[in-house]
Regions:
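The beta1-alpha1 cofactor-binding region of Rossmann-like NAD(H)/NADP(H)-dependent oxidoreductases
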Residues: 10-21, 53
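Conserved NAD(P)H cofactor-binding loop of Rossmann-fold oxidoreductase domains
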Residues: 40-44
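Active-site loop immediately N-terminal to the catalytic Tyr-X3-Lys motif
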Residues: 49, 98-102
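Residue(s) in the substrate-gating loop at a strand-loop-helix junction
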Residues: 91
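C-terminal helical subdomain
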Residues: 124, 131-132, 147-186
Length: 186
């Protein structure tokens, strides 16, 4: 349906210098970038007062700073063309705190805040910004968890929502997409 070109790179998204170099690599191999999906994320369960030192920093580095640094590299190309769409994959944990999700929720609240500021800053440039806030979605990180796979959403559902948001006219944007499993949050 779409004429899409994708390239793979191996990057530790928690290390800002690697993220910035990744951005440079993308720019040098793709002179025109229409869509950026900031989807790097990590989750370490724990309560704020009981979690190991460094967990907050680890999650903020991956969940927030990777999107921040990559966007700062890629978005200027979009602004130059007055066209583009940035999707930040947040979480329902961006709007609702839950037990044992302390620093993860903090990092995702921050990513949603980043998305809102970015949307405000870019709205007159033709570049759209959409925050995607999914609930529990199946991935390999759920392997071994005592839950039926059917209890989780499928990643394809998130991809379809992103695809649909891309199909809108230039005068319309979806600011936030909240999607949860049919049976509710875990």
């Amino acid at each position: 349906k779409y004429n899409v070109q994708c390239t793979g790179f191996q990057v530790d998204m928690s290390i800002s210098s690697q993220v910035k170099q990744f951005g440079e690599n993308i720019i040098s191999s793709h002179h025109s970038i229409d869509v950026l999906v900031n989807n790097a994320g990590v989750f370490y369960p724990g309560e704020i007062l009981k979690e190991e030192d460094g967990k907050l920093e680890a999650m903020v580095n991956t969940n927030l700073y990777s999107a921040y640094h990559l966007t700062r590299k890629i978005a200027p190309l979009m602004v130059e063309r007055n066209k583009g769409h940035i999707f930040n994959i947040c979480s329902v944990a961006s709007i609702i705190a839950y037990p044992n999700g302390g620093s993860y929720s903090i990092s995702k609240f921050a990513l949603l805040g980043f998305s809102k500021v970015l949307r405000e800053e870019l709205k007159t440039t033709g570049v759209k910004v959409t925050s995607v806030l999914p609930g529990a979605t199946w991935s390999n990180s759920w392997k071994g968890v005592d839950l039926p796979e059917e209890r989780l959403m499928q990643a394809e559902d998130i991809a379809k929502l992103i695809s649909n948001a891309l199909d809108l006219s230039p005068s319309a944007t979806v600011e936030e997409i909240v999607i949860r499993p049919q049976l509710g949050d875990l």
